[in-house]
């Protein structure tokens, strides 16, 4: 097993996740099987109870793990399926060590950071790195390890020490370190002092960088590269220029041009890893597909505007998987994507009384969009604005996709304005004692624990069965006319089964349900160009080269190409089945 560690210095949020994902993707083009581990040095057990406005989105895995958003980057770039154990947190590793101490596993010894915690980290890495993550079912060849935060922070100290020991445990030819640093441009001059200081700190902790990836707003000058190489004690070929590009999907090709993979191939002796001809051909095809995808991205002239109506729009990372899924779909449709960010509460009449400009600006964005997306969320703030957005899309014939909460608000809007129940709502927003039974469109799932928040939702990969007589459905056609699909869930509330008949009698058809036939998973409005809602989160399984089908449908419908896309899907997947 080969290990490539990606660490960061100077500041956090510097792009370690994209660089780690891009490095892994390039290693896959050699035919290697690649896995990833993310280390998050916070005390939380997982990201499940963290505010999206503080930490960005919570990414959900097949096994129901609620993890850091970077695991989504790994899955999207590498086309792999990770588990909750691929995300190591301080809280998780401390809990593991403490539970072992309570069992008496340490035989009465004084349990310390070194060696007990650091050994636990190393053991965890070695165990998880061997878990198969792709459709081959084989053990990976390379593990990318991203160390979150900034080297030198007190929170990451135990992990840095564990990695220092780990490099000797696995051997130099099996361990490489890429350090990501910032090269700011001040008054037109590229400054290297922050990088020099970061590398000095890194070396003082016992970690020697094999490559220094320099993040900069512009391409590095040759003199800057030479200066960093000289003062950081590396060769110029070990300094990688990672300047700003139009799209992060260009980063792998940017690294490829600078011979990063050639260096890692030599440094880690990757030529000794046994590969079949099929492995090499698959890797070569991956590179070709990626190059074609970026070319389509560059050559696209037509713009598609999607209004994202949410409640966490102040921090775009709150909807990272959603925006990435829209990007994947737009590239597939050969369109330039323009996301119109609409804060849901700004669509509500109360905002007009307080700030008319904000109100009118938000409605102008919504009304000018080619398609409307209402993503998931929790709580009551902005709900009426989301309902108004769903109403606008339904009445105006604008393509609409509602995800999780988005499905629920679309159902509430339909019950209010089509069925004629103006008091319809969800028991999440109003106590069930305040709602008449017929007005409870969305209810709390009976099996969910109301007392404990962490890990108590309906989580992870679950089947959705397309219902009889749903062959007309666009969303079913987008999935290739299959009878069932498997998608990831994260919710506590569901459509009330008691209102389904009334909804369906008016054309609001629940075309997909769970295996019991009771829980509603997908709806589609008959007679509308594209008005779809999913209780699951299709954004969690979207890949760069294989977009999520509901998102693909939204962008295609917004671009006027839905019929062509459905035809192409059925042709290609029909040929594969033959």
UniProtKB/Swiss-Prot annotation:
Pfam family, one: CTP_synth_N
Gene Ontology molecular-function annotations: ATP binding; CTP synthase activity; identical protein binding
Active site: residue positions: 404, 537, 539
Record comment: activity regulation: Activated by GTP. Subject to allosteric product inhibition by CTP. Inhibited by p-chloromercuriphenylsulfonic acid, N-ethylmaleimide and cyclopentenylcytosine (CPEC).
GO biological process: 'de novo' CTP biosynthetic process; CTP biosynthetic process; pyrimidine nucleobase biosynthetic process
Associated pathway: Pyrimidine metabolism; CTP biosynthesis via de novo pathway; CTP from UDP: step 2/2
EC number: 6.3.4.2
Name of the top EC class for this enzyme: ligase
Chief site of localization: cytoplasm
Positions of the Glutamine amidotransferase type-1 domain: 305-564
Subunit and partners: Homodimer. Oligomerizes to a tetramer in the presence of its substrates UTP and ATP.
Protein name: CTP synthase 2
Originating organism: Saccharomyces cerevisiae (strain ATCC 204508 / S288c)
